[in-house]
From Swiss-Prot:
GO terms for biological process: translation. NCBIfam families: rpmF_bact (TIGR01031). Gene3D superfamilies: Single helix bin (1.20.5.640). This is Large ribosomal subunit protein bL32. InterPro entries: Ribosomal_bL32, Ribosomal_bL32_bact, Ribosomal_zn-bd. It comes from the Bacteria. Keywords: Ribonucleoprotein, Ribosomal protein. The lineage of its organism: Bacteria, Pseudomonadati, Pseudomonadota, Alphaproteobacteria, Hyphomicrobiales. Residues 1-60 are annotated as: Disordered. It comes from Mesorhizobium japonicum (strain LMG 29417 / CECT 9101 / MAFF 303099). Pfam families: Ribosomal_L32p (PF01783). One of its GO terms (molecular function) is structural constituent of ribosome. SUPFAM superfamilies: Zn-binding ribosomal proteins (SSF57829). GO terms for cellular component: large ribosomal subunit. Coiled coil: none annotated.
Amino acid sequence: MAVPKRKTSPSKRGMRRSADALKAPTYVEDKNSGEMRRPHHIDLKTGMYRGRQVLTPKES
């Protein structure tokens, strides 16, 4: 069984764990509707994606 030869310092432990943090999702403003949406996702209000109609718009 593998056993560490040296104790891992708090600095090294923290550097290893720095990649585990949850990042807030990014949002962009839609050019057509002005609504906030995730990048590379369909705008659910208008049903548009990359200038094409891919879904029927939601009725509000």
